[in-house]
Amino acid sequence: MDKKKHGSHAGAHHTDEPAAETVAPAAEGAPAAADRVKELEEALAAKEAEAAANWDKFVRERADLENYRKRTQKEKEELLKYGNESLIVEILPVVDNMERALDHSDDDSASAVIEGVRMTLNMLLSTLKKFGVTVVEAEKGTPFDPAVHQAMCQVENTDVPANSVVEIFQKGYLLNERLIRPAMVSVSK
């Protein structure tokens, strides 16, 4: 019985030892596997954050590119619309001199020359109109508008309301609705 007791004890004892050995390696491997999973999860989170940052950067760059395209298209349109401005500004004094010549001429003297100047002026104004040049509205009695008129002086005048154009010294011009030269006028007090 002793042997049985010892044998059954020995068998029970012998069976417990391998089980403890089997559990021990699993217990040692579990922290290593958990650490590895944690490392992989952290690496995945970092890559996902990097991918999100790259996507945001891509979206911003695409929006910047679209804004650049729109801006360059607008600049191109502006250039086409107002590219002749410096040429037209240089031509306007010629128009002024022709108008002055007609204003100070006698209808009796040299009517053929006067008619030639008148025709030339009309052709020049017609050509300017084709390119979008229009005259600023500035007739006697027109309300003074500092956006398109330049006041050269103020005068007493009861014929027109206060702060109105009395006399036009030089016509103003618009190029496609942009002021390129204000009308020089006298204004009533």
Swiss-Prot record:
Any keyword Chaperone? yes
The record's GO molecular-function terms, alphabetically, read: adenyl-nucleotide exchange factor activity; protein homodimerization activity; protein-folding chaperone binding; unfolded protein binding
Alphabetical list of Pfam families matching this protein:
GrpE
Q: Which GO terms describe its biological process?
A: protein folding
Gene of origin?
grpE
Function text = Participates actively in the response to hyperosmotic and heat shock by preventing the aggregation of stress-denatured proteins, in association with DnaK and GrpE. It is the nucleotide exchange factor for DnaK and may function as a thermosensor. Unfolded proteins bind initially to DnaJ; upon interaction with the DnaJ-bound protein, DnaK hydrolyzes its bound ATP, resulting in the formation of a stable complex. GrpE releases ADP from DnaK; ATP binding to DnaK triggers the release of the substrate protein, thus completing the reaction cycle.
HAMAP family linked to this entry? GrpE
**PROSITE patterns listed in its UniProt record:** GRPE
Q: Where is this region: Disordered?
A: 1-36
* Keywords, alphabetical: Chaperone, Cytoplasm, Stress response
- InterPro entries in the record, alphabetically? GrpE (IPR000740), GrpE_coiled_coil (IPR013805), GrpE_head (IPR009012)
Q: Where is the composition biased (Basic residues)?
A: 1-12
The family note in this entry says: Belongs to the GrpE family.
Subcellular localization, as worded in the UniProt entry: Cytoplasm
Subunit composition? Homodimer.
- Asked if the Swiss-Prot or TrEMBL record annotates the protein with the keyword Isomerase, the reply is no
Q: Where is the composition biased (Low complexity)?
A: 20-34
A GO cellular component annotation in the UniProt record: cytosol
Please identify the protein, giving its name as recorded: Protein GrpE
